[in-house]
């Protein structure tokens, strides 16, 4: 089928298309929002653990500036001091790192759900094509991403420069203060600067959320041709469905040809319906339908019955009900036992007549079918 690649995407996406996008790992999740969460958690940790961090760094500096004569003679002491300092640094930042690890994992799950996508790990040679890469380089998506990076650099630089200039006198004070005061004041300066930078990044995050939402639904939108293709995919190609029906009918014909010669009697409409019944007193609990058909198939069943000398009886109401309420290979419904028993009694009389001769048994008349199983019939035709 030829698809018009220039066809405009005007149709709203279906649930099926949204699920396909999610399977491919395509979601509307904003990376800028994730980055903001990481910065916020880092900022909260800087505030929450400020006393612990300042205390541990003060201790590290205090230990670093104390010298003993043994330290110069024993290298192991120096190594031990370095290791202890590293331990203090890790201890200070351990809660900070754990919380960052959690916030890196949780937001994507909250906003996009758990989606394991291994397709991105497969080798795609089209991505190695320099021509395609060059086209992507100048796509609108890349231009927007580049604009966001430049804007972030600009905002962070402007805010940091302005705040450092504003706090210049405090920064100079750190030079003359003792190391504990320097650490505490320096920590507060960094903390305040981070707070202002995070506030400055909020507009970019809001823009990115809106952009990702717009871009996601733009990609999800479908052309009319895609809608038709999806409908075919869901409901099945009509040509394939027709071939399946033809194959099923062919199987039914073969079963009919095999099973009909085994029947005890054929109950007919007589033109529109034919039902072949088999009953073995020793091995069956009730009569069983072994073949049935309407239209042309019904005529074929009757012809096969004549060829194999099987009794045929015309009971239209019973034939219709058996066809409607019985399946091939299954026992007949209980309410039809009495009507079928009358037919089978006539069949056995016919068999006795064939062996012994005499007067041909009279066919049963006025065979009644229960009202709940009465079926007027739909005169279809089978190919």
UniProtKB/Swiss-Prot annotation:
List the keywords (alphabetical). Bacterial flagellum biogenesis, Bacterial flagellum protein export, Cell membrane, Membrane, Protein transport, Transmembrane, Transmembrane helix, Transport
Entry's Gene Ontology cellular component terms: plasma membrane
Membrane topology, as annotated, equals:
Multi-pass membrane protein
First-listed, main subcellular location of the protein, grouped into a coarse class? membrane
**Any one GO biological process:** protein secretion
Q: Which NCBIfam families match?
A: flhB (TIGR00328)
Q: What does this protein do?
A: Required for formation of the rod structure in the basal body of the flagellar apparatus. Together with FliI and FliH, may constitute the export apparatus of flagellin.
Tell me the protein family, please: Belongs to the type III secretion exporter family.
Q: What is this protein called?
A: Flagellar biosynthetic protein FlhB
Species in which this protein is naturally found: Buchnera aphidicola subsp. Acyrthosiphon pisum (strain APS) (Acyrthosiphon pisum symbiotic bacterium)
Lineage of the organism: Bacteria, Pseudomonadati, Pseudomonadota, Gammaproteobacteria, Enterobacterales
